Amino acid sequence: MRFTCEKSMLLTGLNITGRTVAQKSTLSVIEGILCRADAALNLTGYNMETAITYQIDAEVTDPGQCILPAKLFGDIIRRLPEGPVTVVVDDNYKVSIRSGYASFTISAESAEDYPELPDVGSGRSVSIPQSALKDLISGTIFAVSENQGRPIHTGVKFEVEDNTISAIAVDGFRLARRTYHTEDPTGRNMSFVVPAQGLKEVEKILTDNDENASFVLGQKHILYQIGSATLICRLLEGDFLDWRRVVPTNCPIKLVAHVGDLTSSIERVGLIVSEKYKSPVRCLFGSQVVQLRTSTTIGAAEDQCSIAGDGRELEIGFNVRYLADALRAIPSEEVVLELTNGLSPIVLTPAEDKFDYAYMVLPVRIKNS
Protein backbone atom coordinates (compact mmCIF):
# COMPACT_ATOMS: atom_id res chain seq x y z
CA MET A 1 0.00 0.00 0.00
CA ARG A 2 1.27 3.47 -0.87
CA PHE A 3 -0.44 6.85 -0.65
CA THR A 4 0.38 10.55 -0.36
CA CYS A 5 -1.86 13.18 1.21
CA GLU A 6 -1.66 16.48 3.07
CA LYS A 7 -0.65 16.26 6.73
CA SER A 8 -3.52 18.52 7.84
CA MET A 9 -6.16 16.31 6.21
CA LEU A 10 -4.58 13.12 7.56
CA LEU A 11 -4.37 14.56 11.07
CA THR A 12 -8.02 15.66 10.96
CA GLY A 13 -9.07 12.15 9.98
CA LEU A 14 -6.96 10.57 12.72
CA ASN A 15 -8.32 12.93 15.37
CA ILE A 16 -11.92 12.15 14.42
CA THR A 17 -11.64 8.38 13.98
CA GLY A 18 -9.31 7.95 16.95
CA ARG A 19 -12.14 8.79 19.33
CA THR A 20 -13.91 5.50 18.55
CA VAL A 21 -10.85 3.26 18.62
CA ALA A 22 -11.28 0.65 21.36
CA GLN A 23 -9.03 1.36 24.35
CA LYS A 24 -8.86 -2.20 25.64
CA SER A 25 -10.46 -5.15 23.93
CA THR A 26 -10.16 -8.92 23.71
CA LEU A 27 -10.10 -8.25 19.95
CA SER A 28 -6.77 -6.44 19.71
CA VAL A 29 -7.22 -5.46 16.08
CA ILE A 30 -9.86 -2.83 16.98
CA GLU A 31 -7.34 -1.06 19.21
CA GLY A 32 -5.84 0.29 15.99
CA ILE A 33 -7.10 2.37 13.08
CA LEU A 34 -8.16 0.60 9.90
CA CYS A 35 -6.43 2.29 6.97
CA ARG A 36 -7.84 1.43 3.53
CA ALA A 37 -6.46 3.03 0.38
CA ASP A 38 -8.19 2.62 -2.98
CA ALA A 39 -9.87 5.44 -4.90
CA ALA A 40 -9.42 7.53 -1.74
CA LEU A 41 -7.96 7.03 1.73
CA ASN A 42 -10.42 5.83 4.37
CA LEU A 43 -9.62 5.72 8.09
CA THR A 44 -11.90 3.82 10.50
CA GLY A 45 -12.15 3.57 14.28
CA TYR A 46 -14.62 1.05 15.72
CA ASN A 47 -15.23 0.07 19.36
CA MET A 48 -18.07 -2.38 18.57
CA GLU A 49 -20.67 0.21 19.61
CA THR A 50 -19.80 3.19 17.43
CA ALA A 51 -17.77 3.38 14.22
CA ILE A 52 -16.42 6.46 12.46
CA THR A 53 -14.98 6.37 8.94
CA TYR A 54 -13.30 9.47 7.53
CA GLN A 55 -12.52 9.83 3.82
CA ILE A 56 -9.45 11.78 2.69
CA ASP A 57 -8.43 12.87 -0.80
CA ALA A 58 -5.12 11.13 -1.45
CA GLU A 59 -2.88 10.08 -4.31
CA VAL A 60 -3.06 6.29 -4.07
CA THR A 61 -0.38 4.56 -6.16
CA ASP A 62 -0.70 1.12 -4.57
CA PRO A 63 -4.09 0.15 -3.06
CA GLY A 64 -4.27 -1.90 0.12
CA GLN A 65 -5.27 -1.95 3.76
CA CYS A 66 -3.75 -2.49 7.19
CA ILE A 67 -4.25 -1.75 10.88
CA LEU A 68 -2.11 1.15 12.13
CA PRO A 69 -1.26 1.66 15.82
CA ALA A 70 -3.63 4.52 16.64
CA LYS A 71 -1.66 6.48 19.23
CA LEU A 72 1.82 6.07 17.74
CA PHE A 73 0.76 6.82 14.18
CA GLY A 74 -1.26 9.82 15.36
CA ASP A 75 1.64 11.19 17.42
CA ILE A 76 3.99 10.86 14.45
CA ILE A 77 1.66 12.62 12.01
CA ARG A 78 0.99 15.36 14.56
CA ARG A 79 4.70 16.21 14.79
CA LEU A 80 5.51 16.08 11.08
CA PRO A 81 6.13 19.34 9.19
CA GLU A 82 3.25 20.81 7.23
CA GLY A 83 2.91 19.52 3.69
CA PRO A 84 2.50 16.19 1.91
CA VAL A 85 2.99 12.90 3.79
CA THR A 86 3.85 9.65 2.03
CA VAL A 87 3.01 6.33 3.68
CA VAL A 88 4.23 3.00 2.31
CA VAL A 89 3.28 -0.40 3.76
CA ASP A 90 5.15 -3.49 2.50
CA ASP A 91 4.01 -7.11 2.42
CA ASN A 92 5.41 -7.68 5.92
CA TYR A 93 3.41 -4.71 7.28
CA LYS A 94 6.44 -2.52 7.83
CA VAL A 95 5.27 1.08 7.53
CA SER A 96 7.46 3.86 6.13
CA ILE A 97 6.31 7.42 6.84
CA ARG A 98 8.02 10.35 5.13
CA SER A 99 7.46 14.12 5.14
CA GLY A 100 10.17 16.61 4.25
CA TYR A 101 13.40 15.45 5.88
CA ALA A 102 11.56 13.42 8.55
CA SER A 103 11.08 9.68 8.22
CA PHE A 104 9.78 6.91 10.48
CA THR A 105 9.49 3.15 10.28
CA ILE A 106 6.87 1.39 12.40
CA SER A 107 4.90 -1.87 12.32
CA ALA A 108 1.28 -2.39 11.27
CA GLU A 109 -1.04 -5.42 11.34
CA SER A 110 -3.09 -7.27 8.80
CA ALA A 111 -6.67 -6.05 8.45
CA GLU A 112 -7.91 -9.59 7.84
CA ASP A 113 -9.48 -9.95 11.30
CA TYR A 114 -10.98 -6.45 11.47
CA PRO A 115 -14.74 -6.82 12.07
CA GLU A 116 -17.21 -5.82 9.40
CA LEU A 117 -19.07 -2.60 10.17
CA PRO A 118 -22.83 -2.95 10.73
CA ASP A 119 -24.94 -2.88 7.57
CA VAL A 120 -27.52 -0.14 8.06
CA GLY A 121 -29.17 -0.76 4.72
CA SER A 122 -30.18 1.68 2.03
CA GLY A 123 -33.25 3.31 3.50
CA ARG A 124 -34.32 6.83 2.65
CA SER A 125 -32.09 9.43 4.28
CA VAL A 126 -33.28 12.45 6.23
CA SER A 127 -31.35 15.70 5.78
CA ILE A 128 -30.94 18.46 8.35
CA PRO A 129 -28.57 21.45 8.56
CA GLN A 130 -25.53 20.61 10.66
CA SER A 131 -26.15 23.60 12.92
CA ALA A 132 -29.73 22.44 13.57
CA LEU A 133 -28.70 18.87 14.42
CA LYS A 134 -25.96 20.18 16.69
CA ASP A 135 -28.51 22.40 18.41
CA LEU A 136 -30.89 19.46 18.97
CA ILE A 137 -28.12 17.41 20.56
CA SER A 138 -26.52 20.12 22.72
CA GLY A 139 -29.92 21.29 23.94
CA THR A 140 -30.96 17.89 25.29
CA ILE A 141 -28.00 15.58 25.91
CA PHE A 142 -27.25 17.09 29.32
CA ALA A 143 -30.56 15.67 30.60
CA VAL A 144 -29.96 11.99 29.74
CA SER A 145 -29.93 9.51 32.60
CA GLU A 146 -26.71 8.06 33.97
CA ASN A 147 -28.62 5.19 35.58
CA GLN A 148 -27.80 1.98 33.72
CA GLY A 149 -30.82 0.39 35.38
CA ARG A 150 -32.92 2.04 32.65
CA PRO A 151 -30.60 1.89 29.61
CA ILE A 152 -33.23 3.35 27.27
CA HIS A 153 -33.02 6.68 29.12
CA THR A 154 -29.22 6.89 28.74
CA GLY A 155 -29.87 8.09 25.20
CA VAL A 156 -31.76 10.83 23.38
CA LYS A 157 -35.03 9.99 21.65
CA PHE A 158 -35.56 11.45 18.19
CA GLU A 159 -39.02 11.80 16.71
CA VAL A 160 -39.19 12.50 12.98
CA GLU A 161 -42.52 13.63 11.61
CA ASP A 162 -43.54 15.28 8.36
CA ASN A 163 -42.20 18.76 9.10
CA THR A 164 -40.43 18.38 12.45
CA ILE A 165 -37.48 16.62 14.03
CA SER A 166 -37.59 16.54 17.83
CA ALA A 167 -35.01 15.43 20.40
CA ILE A 168 -36.08 14.42 23.93
CA ALA A 169 -33.99 13.43 26.95
CA VAL A 170 -35.15 12.42 30.45
CA ASP A 171 -33.44 11.22 33.60
CA GLY A 172 -36.32 10.83 36.05
CA PHE A 173 -35.87 14.31 37.54
CA ARG A 174 -35.97 16.53 34.46
CA LEU A 175 -36.86 16.54 30.80
CA ALA A 176 -35.44 18.43 27.83
CA ARG A 177 -37.10 18.77 24.43
CA ARG A 178 -36.06 20.65 21.34
CA THR A 179 -37.86 20.65 18.00
CA TYR A 180 -36.53 21.70 14.60
CA HIS A 181 -39.06 22.69 11.96
CA THR A 182 -37.88 21.56 8.53
CA GLU A 183 -38.23 23.71 5.43
CA ASP A 184 -39.21 20.70 3.34
CA PRO A 185 -41.25 17.66 4.42
CA THR A 186 -39.05 14.82 5.67
CA GLY A 187 -41.29 12.21 4.08
CA ARG A 188 -40.71 10.02 7.11
CA ASN A 189 -42.47 9.23 10.37
CA MET A 190 -40.25 7.39 12.84
CA SER A 191 -38.72 7.44 16.30
CA PHE A 192 -35.49 5.98 17.69
CA VAL A 193 -33.14 6.38 20.67
CA VAL A 194 -29.42 7.07 20.17
CA PRO A 195 -26.95 6.47 23.04
CA ALA A 196 -25.53 9.64 24.54
CA GLN A 197 -21.97 8.45 23.96
CA GLY A 198 -22.57 8.09 20.23
CA LEU A 199 -24.30 11.47 20.04
CA LYS A 200 -21.35 13.14 21.74
CA GLU A 201 -19.18 11.96 18.84
CA VAL A 202 -21.75 13.20 16.33
CA GLU A 203 -21.80 16.59 18.08
CA LYS A 204 -18.00 16.89 17.91
CA ILE A 205 -18.01 16.32 14.14
CA LEU A 206 -20.84 18.75 13.39
CA THR A 207 -20.11 22.36 12.47
CA ASP A 208 -22.15 25.50 13.10
CA ASN A 209 -22.85 26.12 9.42
CA ASP A 210 -25.90 25.28 7.33
CA GLU A 211 -24.31 22.52 5.28
CA ASN A 212 -26.55 19.48 5.46
CA ALA A 213 -25.91 16.35 7.46
CA SER A 214 -28.05 13.28 6.85
CA PHE A 215 -28.97 10.08 8.63
CA VAL A 216 -30.34 6.69 7.62
CA LEU A 217 -32.17 4.49 10.11
CA GLY A 218 -31.57 0.75 10.10
CA GLN A 219 -33.12 -1.98 12.25
CA LYS A 220 -30.55 -1.77 15.04
CA HIS A 221 -28.17 0.99 13.94
CA ILE A 222 -28.23 4.52 12.59
CA LEU A 223 -25.80 5.99 10.06
CA TYR A 224 -24.89 9.69 10.05
CA GLN A 225 -23.18 11.28 7.05
CA ILE A 226 -21.46 14.53 8.02
CA GLY A 227 -19.16 15.91 5.34
CA SER A 228 -16.26 13.47 4.94
CA ALA A 229 -17.23 11.55 8.08
CA THR A 230 -19.58 8.57 8.35
CA LEU A 231 -20.68 7.51 11.84
CA ILE A 232 -22.56 4.30 12.58
CA CYS A 233 -24.03 3.85 16.04
CA ARG A 234 -26.00 1.08 17.73
CA LEU A 235 -29.52 2.13 18.77
CA LEU A 236 -30.99 1.61 22.23
CA GLU A 237 -34.01 -0.64 22.62
CA GLY A 238 -36.84 -0.43 25.14
CA ASP A 239 -39.86 1.64 26.15
CA PHE A 240 -38.99 5.32 26.36
CA LEU A 241 -41.05 7.52 28.67
CA ASP A 242 -44.29 8.83 27.16
CA TRP A 243 -43.08 12.37 27.71
CA ARG A 244 -46.22 14.08 26.41
CA ARG A 245 -48.18 12.69 29.37
CA VAL A 246 -45.82 14.05 32.02
CA VAL A 247 -45.24 17.61 30.81
CA PRO A 248 -47.84 19.93 32.40
CA THR A 249 -50.02 22.05 30.14
CA ASN A 250 -52.14 25.10 30.92
CA CYS A 251 -50.18 26.00 34.05
CA PRO A 252 -52.03 28.76 35.96
CA ILE A 253 -48.90 30.78 36.81
CA LYS A 254 -46.75 32.19 34.01
CA LEU A 255 -43.79 34.42 34.77
CA VAL A 256 -41.06 35.95 32.62
CA ALA A 257 -37.45 36.43 33.70
CA HIS A 258 -34.19 37.55 32.12
CA VAL A 259 -32.21 34.36 31.45
CA GLY A 260 -28.81 35.82 32.31
CA ASP A 261 -29.97 37.46 35.54
CA LEU A 262 -31.84 34.41 36.82
CA THR A 263 -29.00 32.06 35.89
CA SER A 264 -26.48 34.25 37.72
CA SER A 265 -28.64 34.36 40.84
CA ILE A 266 -29.06 30.58 40.89
CA GLU A 267 -25.35 30.01 40.32
CA ARG A 268 -24.52 32.38 43.18
CA VAL A 269 -26.72 30.68 45.75
CA GLY A 270 -25.52 27.34 44.43
CA LEU A 271 -21.92 28.05 45.40
CA ILE A 272 -22.38 26.39 48.78
CA VAL A 273 -24.13 23.35 47.31
CA SER A 274 -22.01 20.37 46.22
CA GLU A 275 -22.26 16.61 45.80
CA LYS A 276 -21.25 16.30 49.46
CA TYR A 277 -23.39 19.14 50.80
CA LYS A 278 -26.65 18.77 48.89
CA SER A 279 -29.57 21.08 49.47
CA PRO A 280 -32.29 22.41 47.17
CA VAL A 281 -32.54 26.05 46.22
CA ARG A 282 -35.76 27.47 47.68
CA CYS A 283 -37.52 29.71 45.16
CA LEU A 284 -40.22 32.04 46.51
CA PHE A 285 -42.10 33.47 43.54
CA GLY A 286 -43.72 36.75 44.54
CA SER A 287 -44.98 39.80 42.71
CA GLN A 288 -42.29 41.03 40.28
CA VAL A 289 -39.52 39.21 42.15
CA VAL A 290 -38.29 35.70 42.95
CA GLN A 291 -36.31 35.21 46.15
CA LEU A 292 -33.68 32.46 46.13
CA ARG A 293 -32.05 30.92 49.17
CA THR A 294 -30.31 27.76 50.24
CA SER A 295 -28.38 26.48 53.22
CA THR A 296 -26.05 23.58 53.94
CA THR A 297 -23.79 22.68 56.85
CA ILE A 298 -21.11 24.96 55.40
CA GLY A 299 -23.24 28.10 55.15
CA ALA A 300 -26.21 29.88 53.65
CA ALA A 301 -26.87 32.10 50.64
CA GLU A 302 -29.67 34.41 49.49
CA ASP A 303 -30.35 36.40 46.35
CA GLN A 304 -33.28 37.69 44.34
CA CYS A 305 -34.12 38.34 40.71
CA SER A 306 -36.73 40.52 39.03
CA ILE A 307 -39.56 38.79 37.17
CA ALA A 308 -42.61 39.92 35.24
CA GLY A 309 -45.83 38.61 36.74
CA ASP A 310 -47.19 37.47 40.09
CA GLY A 311 -45.99 34.15 41.50
CA ARG A 312 -48.70 34.21 44.21
CA GLU A 313 -46.06 33.67 46.94
CA LEU A 314 -45.51 30.13 45.70
CA GLU A 315 -42.41 28.50 47.23
CA ILE A 316 -40.77 25.55 45.49
CA GLY A 317 -37.48 23.72 45.97
CA PHE A 318 -35.31 22.67 43.02
CA ASN A 319 -32.02 20.93 42.42
CA VAL A 320 -29.60 23.80 41.75
CA ARG A 321 -27.75 22.11 38.89
CA TYR A 322 -30.88 20.93 37.10
CA LEU A 323 -32.43 24.40 37.13
CA ALA A 324 -29.19 26.06 36.03
CA ASP A 325 -28.70 23.52 33.21
CA ALA A 326 -32.19 24.23 31.88
CA LEU A 327 -31.64 27.99 31.96
CA ARG A 328 -28.27 27.73 30.21
CA ALA A 329 -29.99 25.82 27.40
CA ILE A 330 -32.50 28.62 26.77
CA PRO A 331 -31.35 30.47 23.60
CA SER A 332 -33.43 33.64 24.07
CA GLU A 333 -32.80 36.59 26.40
CA GLU A 334 -35.98 35.92 28.35
CA VAL A 335 -37.51 32.73 29.70
CA VAL A 336 -41.13 31.88 30.50
CA LEU A 337 -41.57 30.02 33.79
CA GLU A 338 -44.79 28.00 34.05
CA LEU A 339 -45.89 26.86 37.52
CA THR A 340 -48.85 25.09 39.10
CA ASN A 341 -48.11 24.42 42.78
CA GLY A 342 -45.29 23.47 45.12
CA LEU A 343 -45.43 19.79 44.19
CA SER A 344 -45.69 20.13 40.42
CA PRO A 345 -42.85 20.51 37.91
CA ILE A 346 -41.71 23.84 36.53
CA VAL A 347 -41.69 24.21 32.75
CA LEU A 348 -39.22 26.60 31.13
CA THR A 349 -39.62 27.81 27.55
CA PRO A 350 -37.94 30.58 25.52
CA ALA A 351 -39.94 33.79 25.42
CA GLU A 352 -39.40 34.04 21.65
CA ASP A 353 -41.86 32.00 19.59
CA LYS A 354 -39.22 31.07 17.00
CA PHE A 355 -37.69 28.58 19.46
CA ASP A 356 -39.70 25.38 19.92
CA TYR A 357 -37.96 24.23 23.09
CA ALA A 358 -39.18 23.13 26.53
CA TYR A 359 -37.49 22.06 29.76
CA MET A 360 -39.20 20.51 32.75
CA VAL A 361 -37.66 20.16 36.22
CA LEU A 362 -39.30 18.25 39.05
CA PRO A 363 -39.46 19.97 42.44
CA VAL A 364 -37.62 18.83 45.56
CA ARG A 365 -39.71 18.58 48.70
CA ILE A 366 -38.64 21.25 51.18
CA LYS A 367 -39.25 21.62 54.89
CA ASN A 368 -41.19 24.59 56.17
CA SER A 369 -38.94 27.23 57.66
Name each model-derived stretch.
Residues 1-369:
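Structural preference for solvent-exposed beta-strand-turn elements
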